[in-house]
């Protein structure tokens, strides 16, 4: 029996296969089952071109046989088998794909699904085995052959005995060590779990002898174990079935079976695409937030399949972060079964699929907002924050993609409205989209800064989440209408002449108030927005008061401060008390000014810088 060397570069390639392409040992079974499925496919294709041959699918299956005594695992198929020449060419040259060659020689169109076209899957067996034996008999041949190798010193090919065509791959498992327990791949539960995980949708039955228990004949309570051959895989992927044959229950049951969630999904999408890219997909939009969704532990991603064989449990490259809540699967014939996570990042087909999926999700959400508002509001309550993060993230790169999906509570409608709905009903003389920021709708409704805007009959959007104002600052405008905080210095509705006159007339008292407060504020001015309140705070520049609150609460904050302006209602009776105090008692004037400033801080939800001084000032006032 002649010892043959692997072809040139094959030793180096074998090392790459074992140590680089495959980073997870357990996928060896997936690879060998996929090869077995391909081998049966080839028999089927042969029969299509020869009327004298028949193909009865019930006769074809894949058998997994563990042997604990000999520490071997055998994967058998009734596939096309290999001749001596094919053994030498296909298994003697690493990264040569017999399936790809078969497609070329038989001019098979891409519609014929053969899983393995990369040519390295067989060698994944060396992840768990220190020797592999292959016994094979080619379809229509008289002789069988045995190929054997330890993966290091080449291989041997010799004649063998085999009754029917097909292939047996016998893995002689490595010895256990401190890091790996290879015996687990001989355990029934482990083999079943790997088949269900990676190869559940292989189109031929995968059979395994399973130990079961039953009541022993002639007894009532005595049990005995027996072995029964069982088909482990379900074979038909839901996503490849006709949509018209499926019910909501089918989709909901699949959602639970795949453990995407334990409640009913809010929406499902069944996608089939053929053209520049080809893939099938079932996607789900959950109704409720996963308990860990807004934590570092949460992993986004879709299950990724190649021809029904699982490549990756969570392929994050298929979803942008702002759609990270979507669950589901993607199956494509255009992806290599052996693709690694590193290779995925540069895979053009995957990028095209991801782009298409992103568009499908956006269209589904837009349709839900338009045609099923109640469901969309449920979704938005759970995941609206994620969309707003998407607007703000990456320097606003995705803001145009997401702006039409945003919703905020409306002062006028008393419910959630979209930006498009707000703009459609804006008054002709209204320059801006007005918003107010606060901890809750109730707090915002009591804000003194809203009085003037509401008196004009203008609608205000309520921002109650930390990310809201950051997202809107990044968005800047919507349909050419700029956003304006009700707390900003210029609302665009005040009379400039009246403001100028008011500030000139009270210049002295405002300068005295500024002097009393020092660097706490950048200016004091007359307010045209206040009716019932004596003072309020507004801001100038890009950083609002609410943004300062959020930034200051963050770890390692940089001490970013808003440029605060104290606005004074000159028509309020308190203002008369201020003027009297300035003329008659400067200390009392300073006391009043500080109290009013602290009052404005409290109304704004800001903390008082020195609570002890504040309480002492109140006591002085009461004397």
UniProtKB/Swiss-Prot annotation:
Residue ranges of the region described as A: 1-341
SUPFAM superfamilies: ATPase domain of HSP90 chaperone/DNA topoisomerase II/histidine kinase, HSP90 C-terminal domain, Ribosomal protein S5 domain 2-like
Compartments, record wording: Cytoplasm
Protein's organism: Clostridium perfringens (strain 13 / Type A)
Chief location bin: cytoplasm
Classification via PANTHER family: HEAT SHOCK PROTEIN 90 FAMILY MEMBER
Region (C): 550-623
Name of protein: Chaperone protein HtpG
Signal peptide: none
Source species, domain of life: Bacteria
NCBIfam families: PRK05218.1
GO cellular component: a single term: cytoplasm
Annotated segments matching region B: 342-549
Subunit description: Homodimer.
Record InterPro entries: HATPase_C_sf, Heat_shock_protein_90_CS, HSP90_C, Hsp90_fam, Hsp90_N, Ribosomal_Su5_D2-typ_SF
Gene label: htpG
Keywords, comma-separated and alphabetical: ATP-binding, Chaperone, Cytoplasm, Nucleotide-binding, Stress response
Family: Belongs to the heat shock protein 90 family.
Record's function text: Molecular chaperone. Has ATPase activity.
CDD domains referenced in this protein's UniProt entry, alphabetically: HATPase_Hsp90-like
């Amino acid at each position: 029996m002649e010892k043959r060397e692997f072809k040139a570069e094959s030793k180096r390639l074998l090392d790459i296969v074992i140590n680089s392409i495959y980073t997870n040992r357990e996928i060896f079974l997936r690879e060998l089952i996929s090869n077995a499925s391909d081998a049966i496919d080839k028999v089927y294709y042969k029969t299509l071109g020869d009327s004298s041959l028949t193909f009865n699918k019930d006769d074809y299956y894949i058998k997994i046989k563990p042997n604990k005594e000999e520490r071997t695992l055998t994967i058998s198929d009734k596939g096309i088998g290999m001749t001596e020449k094919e053994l030498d060419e296909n298994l003697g040259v690493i990264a040569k794909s017999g399936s790809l060659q078969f497609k070329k020689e038989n001019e098979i169109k891409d519609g014929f699904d053969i899983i393995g076209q990369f040519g390295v899957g067989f060698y994944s067996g060396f992840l768990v085995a220190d020797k592999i034996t292959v016994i094979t008999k080619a379809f229509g041949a008289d002789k069988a052959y045995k190929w054997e190798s330890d993966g290091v010193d080449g291989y041997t090919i010799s004649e063998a005995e085999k009754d029917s065509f097909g292939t047996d791959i016998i893995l002689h498992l490595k010895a256990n060590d401190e890091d790996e327990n290879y015996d687990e791949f001989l355990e029934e539960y482990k083999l079943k779990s790997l088949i269900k995980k990676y190869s559940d949708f292989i189109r031929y039955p995968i059979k395994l002898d399973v130990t079961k228990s039953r009541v022993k004949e002639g007894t009532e309570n005595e049990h005995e174990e027996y072995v029964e051959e069982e088909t482990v895989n379900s074979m038909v992927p839901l996503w490849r079935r006709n949509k018209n044959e499926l019910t909501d229950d089918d989709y909901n049951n699949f959602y639970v079976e795949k453990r995407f969630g334990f409640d009913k999904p809010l929406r499902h999408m069944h996608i089939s695409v053929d053209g520049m890219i080809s893939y099938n997909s079932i996607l789900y939009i959950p109704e409720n937030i996963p308990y860990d969704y807004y934590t570092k532990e949460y992993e986004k991603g879709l299950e990724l399949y190649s021809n029904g064989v699982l490549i990756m449990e969570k392929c994050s490259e298929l979803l942008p972060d702002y759609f990270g809540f979507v669950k589901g699967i993607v199956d494509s014939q255009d992806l290599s079964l052996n693709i690694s996570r590193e290779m995925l990042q540069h895979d053009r087909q995957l990028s095209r699929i991801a782009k298409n999926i992103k568009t499908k999700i956006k269209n589904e959400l837009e349709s839900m907002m338009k045609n099923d508002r109640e469901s969309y509001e449920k979704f938005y309550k759970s995941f609206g924050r994620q969309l707003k993060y998407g607007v703000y993230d990456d320097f606003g790169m995705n803001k145009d993609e997401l702006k039409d999906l945003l919703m905020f509570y409306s002062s006028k409608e008393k419910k959630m409205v979209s930006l498009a709905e707000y703009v459609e009903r804006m008054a002709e003389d209204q320059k801006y989209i007005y918003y107010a920021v606060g901890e809750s709708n109730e707090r915002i409704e009591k804000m003194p800064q809203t009085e003037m805007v509401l008196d004009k009959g203008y609608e205000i959007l309520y921002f109650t989440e930390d990310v809201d104002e950051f997202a809107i600052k990044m968005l800047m405008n919507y349909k050419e209408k700029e956003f304006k905080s009700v707390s900003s210095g210029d609302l665009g509705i005040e009379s400039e002449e009246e403001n100028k006159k008011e500030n000139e007339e009270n210049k002295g008292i405002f300068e005295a108030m500024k002097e009393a407060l020092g660097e706490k504020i950048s200016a004091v001015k007359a307010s045209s927005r206040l009716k019932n309140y004596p003072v309020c705070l507004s801001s100038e520049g890009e950083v609002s008061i609410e943004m300062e609150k959020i930034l200051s609460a963050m770890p390692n904050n940089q001490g970013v401060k808003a440029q605060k302006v104290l606005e004074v209602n000159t028509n309020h009776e308190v203002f008369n008390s201020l003027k009297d105090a300035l003329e008659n008692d400067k200390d009392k004037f300073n006391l009043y000014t500080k109290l009013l400033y602290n009052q404005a801080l409290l109304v704004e939800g800001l903390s008082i810088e020195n609570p002890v001084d504040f309480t002492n000032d109140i006591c002085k006032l009461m004397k």
